[in-house]
Amino acid sequence: MSPTIITSLFGSILRLGRTYTPPMGTPNGIAELQPVELNGYPQWLLIRGQDVSRPLLLFLHGGPGESNMWLAHYTMKELEKYFVCVNWDQRGTGKSFRPGPPPESMTIDQFVKDTIALIEPLLARFGQQKVLLLGHSWGSVLAMKVAAARPDLLFAVIGMGQVVDNRRGEDLSYRYVLERAHAEHNRKAIRILEQLGGSDTFRKDGKFIQRRWLVRYGGMMHALDTGAVVSILLNTPEWSIGDCISALTMRDMKFSIRRMGDEVIGVNLLQEIPELSVPVFFFTGGYDYTTPFVLVEQFYASLHAPYKKLIWFEHSAHMPHMEEPDKFQRELIALADEFCSEKHPQDALVATMKKEQL
């Protein structure tokens, strides 16, 4: 264990159950860590921004069961100047794991309802009409479904590490790691992977075994050391040592996949969402074999939308916000400048389209 991780672990232990979010330090800023009740179940929000009049950016994390709250200070610090950034631990995840959501509530439809139930009071509280919705991996499924159901709530929708045809994506991901194992003559990996099979592993704990090999072969993270990730996690003031341990052991993701795996593996947005009425963006890693980029290209090509754009992160796999945080934030800031206008969102859209046609 590296000295950095040991130091971070010691600091996390000292923190024990005391969690907080650092003050913003600006006259019109906000820094809140608090629970809210969404459709009868308590769920936690982290809200940070230097100016409460800025547009709302809602981040929908992946998994299901994989929080983004612990990454807020690493991946969204600059964004706090331009947005009111909202990180939400969905039911069954992170700080929203307990008291334990009813098993029957762990459905895609319920998560979509939770998302809408979160957006509406946020808009009312901050006196705004629309949010910028960003979904990562599993969160990209929610984002697209919310965009289809309630486009009136959104400036635009962004899919990062976009899930498209989940069963086909899992098969491609499985074949990638198996091919890499054969290429390096890794007998142990070949034996383990051949015992697992393809997309069927998604509904079993075998998914997590496949993901460990995917991390090794760069299809999850291409340009980020796992030790650095652990250090970021352990230094998160919003999370207790218990929250950190749960993330490291993948407790929440295992809980969620065991209850939702059969439904989630069947997601196929190529069939379910052929068109959207809001601007759509895709943030895609050039080495992503978790939600393979070839399927994102296919979805991008087939999707009908008033405006759409595919933005490549050439040095990333499935985690562009972690692997290229500066570019991730620059792209969102530029997007906000063009699309997040309360007064004239359509004028901003037309101006952007004309500029790109020049």
Predicted regions and their residues:
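Short beta-strand/loop motif that positions the catalytic acidic residue
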Residues: L276, F282-T284, D288
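Alpha/beta-hydrolase
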Residues: E179-R180, R187-Q271, V278
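A catalytic-pocket lid/entrance helix-loop region that shapes and gates access to the active site
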Residues: D152-D200
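The serine-hydrolase catalytic nucleophile loop
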Residues: P64-M76
